Amino acid sequence: MKIFLDTANLNDIKAGVSLGVVDGVTTNPSLVAKEGVSLENRINQIAEICNGPISAEVIADKRDEMVAEAEELTKISPNIVVKIPLTQDGLQATKVLSEKNINTNLTLVFSLNQAILAAKAGATYVSPFVGRVDDIGGNGMQLVEEIVTTFNQYAINTEVIAASIRHPRHVTEAARIGCDIVTIPKAVLEKMVNHPLTDKGIEKFMEDWHKNKQK
């Protein structure tokens, strides 16, 4: 399973990449806005840090404008994946872009039906939002499992990115069901690294080591 970082913060990306476990980055307009920079500048900066796929989302909401914006985004770096919301115009734009061999990530996916349509339109990736489904009383990981199972059944090449990940348990469940990718904030990555028993084990090893040296 691949791990993407869901952030537009350069320090977070540098920290994640330095661990040697980050395969790509996903951003959205809200994350970029928090950084107070233009999308083009920030994506350029991210591309200098991360060699993997970088999802950058279009702002337009009509097919032709989405396509035009996507074509401009792909000029920034060969690693750009154009992130498109799953709407009727988004599906139409995805079909056009797939025929131009431009990679797309269909985002804001909340049902298996939406995921199927994204794949039919030629999406490279589809991003079901786990946490947001949970927020309305649904089961986000069950949705991911349904998508993964269906895509496997029909040998669909579209990769599934479990998004809106809130805690390490989501990552564990995604791995167990065979999800292709999880995209996570830095806080979740840090929680995946840390474990109290690891810390206690290190303390015990060091304590025994120093005792032995004093003999």
Curated annotation (Swiss-Prot):
InterPro entries: Aldolase_TIM (IPR013785), TAL/FSA (IPR001585), Transaldolase_3B (IPR022999), Transaldolase_3B/F6P_aldolase (IPR004731), Transaldolase_AS (IPR018225), TSA/FSA_arc/bac (IPR033919). It comes from Natranaerobius thermophilus (strain ATCC BAA-1301 / DSM 18059 / JW/NM-WN-LF). CDD domains: Transaldolase_FSA. GO terms for molecular function: aldehyde-lyase activity; transaldolase activity. This is Probable transaldolase. Transaldolase is important for the balance of metabolites in the pentose-phosphate pathway. NCBIfam families: fsa_talC_mipB. It is found in: Cytoplasm. Keywords: Cytoplasm, Pentose shunt, Schiff base, Transferase. It holds the Pfam family TAL_FSA. One of its GO terms (cellular component) is cytoplasm. Belongs to the transaldolase family. Type 3B subfamily. HAMAP family: Transaldolase_3b. The active site is at K83. Gene3D superfamilies: Aldolase class I (3.20.20.70). Its EC number is 2.2.1.2. It is an enzyme of class 2 (transferase).
